[in-house]
């Protein structure tokens, strides 16, 4: 997209995940984050081959379809399927650099992660380049420590952390914002296990996604 078509006062956010399946533990905290940080659009990025996790049970097209069903009619969300076309592992920094190049150097850009991911961020591929490309918006997660593993990592966090979300739209990248979002005890692993056991998942994910899972015979 041409750089001159972008509003450089609006923060654009991206949220990656395997989404195997997508559920309310993904959607509800991001909706709360959007209200807290003034986001008007969050683009979901389904992973193809996550480098640090087991292979998904659902295939790429099934996971994309579940994301599309989950966000249908919700103007906050969009989906970008670029990672599903990769044949190599999906490294976050490579995707972010490609999006930054497309959208221009001046656009405020943020990547949403969970608190659990923040604590292991130093194990990610080229993790120290992330803040050269975007801001990090961190969702609260139940049961996780709020401090980094080492004094050096904690210092890195404190050097980049801001508590005023308004600052995120004033520069293109470089900040970390720890959001006060709902901590939902929902995981895709739990949903898959419940499906394997024939248990009800009504309160865990949108009904449209449930219907698709049932029609496709997923997670049996």
UniProtKB/Swiss-Prot annotation:
Pathway of action: Cofactor biosynthesis; NAD(+) biosynthesis; deamido-NAD(+) from nicotinate D-ribonucleotide: step 1/1
One GO MF term on file is: ATP binding
Supply the enzyme class, top level. transferase
Q: What is its EC number?
A: 2.7.7.18
The family database entries (InterPro entries) matched by this protein are listed as: Cyt_trans-like, NadD/NMNAT, Rossmann-like_a/b/a_fold
What CDD domains has UniProt attached to this entry? Answer: NMNAT
Query: This protein's superkingdom?
Result: Bacteria
Which stretch is the leader sequence? none
Enumerate the UniProt keywords alphabetically: ATP-binding, NAD, Nucleotide-binding, Nucleotidyltransferase, Pyridine nucleotide biosynthesis, Transferase
Q: Which reaction does it catalyse?
A: nicotinate beta-D-ribonucleotide + ATP + H(+) = deamido-NAD(+) + diphosphate
GO biological process assignments: NAD biosynthetic process
**Record family assignment:** Belongs to the NadD family.
| UniProt function note | Catalyzes the reversible adenylation of nicotinate mononucleotide (NaMN) to nicotinic acid adenine dinucleotide (NaAD).
Q: Which HAMAP family match?
A: NaMN_adenylyltr
**Protein name stated in the entry:** Probable nicotinate-nucleotide adenylyltransferase
Organism lineage reads as: Bacteria, Pseudomonadati, Pseudomonadota, Gammaproteobacteria, Enterobacterales
């Amino acid at each position: 997209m041409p750089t001159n078509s972008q509003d450089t006062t609006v923060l654009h956010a991206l949220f990656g995940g395997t989404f195997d399946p997508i559920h309310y533990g993904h959607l509800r905290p991001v909706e709360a984050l959007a209200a807290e940080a003034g986001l008007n659009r969050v683009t979901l990025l389904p992973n193809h081959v996550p480098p640090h996790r087991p292979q998904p049970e659902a295939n790429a097209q099934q996971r994309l379809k579940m994301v599309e069903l989950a966000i249908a009619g919700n103007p906050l969300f969009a989906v970008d399927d670029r990672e599903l076309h990769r044949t190599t592992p999906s490294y976050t920094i490579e995707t972010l650099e490609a999006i930054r190049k497309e959208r221009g150097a001046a656009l405020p850009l943020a990547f949403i992660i969970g608190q659990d991911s923040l604590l292991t961020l130093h194990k990610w591929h080229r993790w120290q380049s992330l803040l050269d490309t975007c801001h990090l918006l961190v969702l609260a997660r139940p049961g996780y420590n709020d401090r980094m593993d080492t004094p050096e990592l904690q210092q890195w966090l404190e050097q980049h952390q801001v508590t005023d979300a308004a600052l995120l739209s004033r520069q293109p990248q470089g900040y970390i914002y720890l959001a006060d979002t709902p901590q939902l005890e929902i995981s895709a692993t739990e949903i898959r296990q419940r499906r394997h056991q024939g248990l009800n998942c009504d309160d865990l994910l949108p009904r449209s996604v449930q219907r698709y899972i049932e029609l496709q015979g997923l997670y049996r």
